[in-house]
């Protein structure tokens, strides 16, 4: 699975080194939750993906890190949605492989209603996320990181 390696703080767009940054943040905030999500948008000739890591303080509020990457236009919706899942899962696996705790949730921009095209990817996505021991959330389950990723894509 692919992992994005150019990360920034959303608050000031400052580049960060992801693992040392997270280690420091977790040490200072031992009671917290971590959410990961990805969204994408198609432009006329390119597809932009934004993967976010939401660091949720136990007292409320959050701190957001993001990575944005652009690819040649991906016209196939299924392929684009699956790549969103891959970026989220790849990010979670990268964190765990580097000694960080397992994220609390991976949020996916997929709909449980079969009337929507994103539903075609939902079962496979949930299975993949659960197979690495992380709780998936999807539309109707309050996936915070997806709405943040949507804004980071633009």
Regions found by a protein language model. Name each.
Residues 45-49, 114-121, 148-149:
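A short acidic (Asp/Glu
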């Amino acid at each position: 699975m692919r992992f994005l390696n150019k990360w920034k703080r959303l608050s000031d767009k400052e580049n960060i080194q992801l693992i040392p940054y997270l280690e420091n943040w977790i040490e200072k905030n031992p009671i917290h939750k971590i959410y990961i999500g990805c969204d994408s948008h198609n432009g006329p000739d390119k597809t932009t993906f934004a993967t976010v890591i939401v660091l949720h303080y136990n007292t409320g509020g959050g701190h957001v890190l993001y990575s944005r990457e652009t690819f040649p236009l991906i016209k196939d919706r299924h392929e684009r949605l699956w790549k969103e899942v891959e970026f989220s899962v790849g990010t979670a696996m990268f964190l765990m492989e580097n000694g960080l705790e397992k994220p609390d949730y991976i949020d996916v921009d997929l709909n449980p209603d079969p009337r929507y095209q994103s539903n075609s990817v939902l079962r496979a996505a949930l299975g993949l996320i659960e197979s690495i021991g992380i709780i998936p959330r999807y539309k109707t389950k309050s996936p915070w990181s997806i709405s943040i990723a949507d804004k980071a894509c633009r």
